[in-house]
């Protein structure tokens, strides 16, 4: 086994130059009585995920929920007010009726328990229609991101946050902050690392992309999103277990790291692809895979819109290299995984299963074909769906 030298490991600089850390240090003197009498705000699933991403530095250079100038700049220019690339406004919405209650230090709660604080510096009106048109490219409430946008409050609170403790959730063994992922990359001596994200169960086309890129870089960060997703998406626990069995049998362990990505899905397609790439830079990653319809839903985005949007920035601004792949699939005639660039055969030779088709087969108790996914992964999915009956 080749051992990489750690002598010259230089990880990518976090966006903005410094990895934000707004997590209260362990052992810090803290008197819960300090929170008594302060206004309390119960966080939604998405806002709680945003709090963690902000506080741990995954959303560096942001130190809290966006103020109005940054909010409008991100919507209209895909940049913060100072020009830093940023594609999706990270906001904390409340109802207009409640907004006046929140001033100064606000206690953020989850299930009634205090999990952090927000120092309110601004309250401003959300431009929901503008945000829907520019960020999601539609005002159609059948789009899950747009539906969530219109369902939330119409006033945004802004200011720096503090997180009391990193929530390790259901995957403590795989839950690492950006600084912790950076430490693993440094310890392993990876000069170049590629990150891959999906909210879907892993299949052979994903594996193909992973192994092609492992020919080019030192390490692979498998970074499945485990925050809030649509109700019909495969549950995070099932997806993580599928990754575990795949890594056990088919991946080089010394060159692969499985770590969960606790963000919530917004289904913003191209805009969300940028957010996913920039945040991976903060995790210390040098390359990020963007495939077909990354972070998309339905027919709202073109197949490769999420790849083309990166031309809005220079490579130096991005600070992470985007690896763009076409749709890959199994060709029965070629007898292997291919793409339109490498296969001369028509679609009748190809095995392509959509996410909807996969879910239909699983609900019907059918086993997924070996050409589509590894047998071990197929069994994990079959058991998970059988348990739902």
Curated annotation (Swiss-Prot):
InterPro entries registered for this protein in UniProt: ATP-Sase_PUA-like_dom (IPR025980), PUA-like_sf (IPR015947), Rossmann-like_a/b/a_fold (IPR014729), SO4_adenylyltransferase_pro (IPR020792), Sulfurylase_cat_dom (IPR024951), Sulphate_adenylyltransferase (IPR002650)
Q: In which pathway does it act?
A: Sulfur metabolism; hydrogen sulfide biosynthesis; sulfite from sulfate: step 1/3
Q: One Pfam match, by short name?
A: ATP-sulfurylase
Record's catalysed reaction(s): sulfate + ATP + H(+) = adenosine 5'-phosphosulfate + diphosphate
The protein's UniProt keywords, in alphabetical order, are: ATP-binding, Nucleotide-binding, Nucleotidyltransferase, Transferase
Q: Which SUPFAM superfamilies match?
A: Nucleotidylyl transferase (SSF52374), PUA domain-like (SSF88697)
Entries under HAMAP family matching the protein: Sulf_adenylyltr
Record NCBIfam families:
PRK04149.1, sopT
Q: Which family does it belong to?
A: Belongs to the sulfate adenylyltransferase family.
Q: What is this protein called?
A: Sulfate adenylyltransferase
Supply the source organism for this entry: Deinococcus geothermalis (strain DSM 11300 / CIP 105573 / AG-3a)
